[in-house]
Amino acid sequence: MKAEGARRRDVTVADVAKAAQVSKAQAARALGNYGAVSEDVRERVLAAAEALAYRPNELARSMNTGKSHTIGVVVGDIENPHFGLATRGITDTAKKAGYNVILVNTDEDRAAEVDAVRVLLDKRVDGLIVAPASSVDTGHLQEVHRSGRPLVFIDRTAGDMPVETMAVDMARISREATQYLLDAGHRRIAFISTLTTDAPYTAGMALGSSQIADRIEGMREAYLDSGLDFPEDLVRLNAGDEDSIRSITREVLRGPDRATAVVASDGLIALSVVEAIQELGLSFPGDVSFLMYDDFAWTRLTSPPLTVIAQPVYNMGVAAAKALIRQMEGLPSAAPAQFTATLVRRGSVGPCPERSANEPELEAVDR
């Protein structure tokens, strides 16, 4: 007697053929909707398949047809609503075009991304959409590109690979947001990110994420344009969990040379930063100004509402899926999609509370 709960054997084409009293080849043609088969045979095969709860072997089908009608999506942190919105845009678009989506989360780990890409290719996905965990170590992605497998990047680039990429100009919007804070009198502006590095940030160090590198570069450009020194000591990376985010926030907001404004690189960091500010008994914008990347519903419900950098993330997901489907179906490439992030000015940014009377005014510097 089989043990209770033992796994039931999958129903095969041979089982369906036997039940329908036809050959295996006839059953395969009827189930796959290809080749010549009589209407009587087709009806018997489909009835037998339904009675046996037959499910097609998608891997075998893809080996026969060369297509699985499946898209692989690899993102860094599905807990982050940023990627949730992007993925929704991808899946909505893929579904309309008749494609399924397999989603893999990497926790922004390159080794996990390498494994994810390998697994998805083993499952014979028709194409890949990837938010690269590293813009430097991209050998696995270059291999996919060289193989001719359709590939699209979302949110970040991967070095100088000639791959369609759906992302905003991070340096531009970071420069604009930093200039907004500088115009309000802030000079000590902290930037907090989850990006993992082996050492504290210093100018010129290689950063694995093009997105974070561009944001820091945009901040640096705004300071340079204003004739000011960029406070490298306030670029804080490795904020990988709630405790480290709170600890970093407390560090940058204490002492005589503390930060007077904080920029959070994503919504998850922002939640912990806001909590840490409240725990310190500070308020914004009176004690400290605050700005974050991405615009989520909760940012409008705080008091005051938070100033944010809004990105068209859902539309980026839609565009990524459309671009990949065009590649998979051999259609001509469209003009490169352009996406613009927007600085949404609400109530969490105000004048610098500690600006001294003898501190120099901003000066525009020609570059």
For every predicted segment, state its role.
Residues M1-H69, E361-R367:
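N-terminal helix-turn-helix DNA-binding module of bacterial transcription factors
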Residues K2-G5, A51, D92-A97, H145-F153, ...:
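Bacterial carbohydrate/catabolite-sensing allosteric modules
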Residues A19, K24-R29, N64-I78, R188-M205:
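Short beta-strand segments enriched in small/hydrophobic residues
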Residues E39, E43, L52-G127, M205, ...:
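Amphipathic helical "hinge" segments at domain boundaries
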Residues A60, V114-V117, L141, T178, ...:
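Short hydrophobic/charged patches on amphipathic alpha-helices used for structural packing
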Residues I102-V104, G127-V130, V263, A310:
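Short catalytic-loop micro-motif centered on adjacent basic/acidic residues
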Residues D107-R110, A131-V136, L268:
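Short beta->alpha connector loops
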Residues V136-H145:
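Active-site-adjacent beta->alpha loops and helix N-cap segments on the catalytic face
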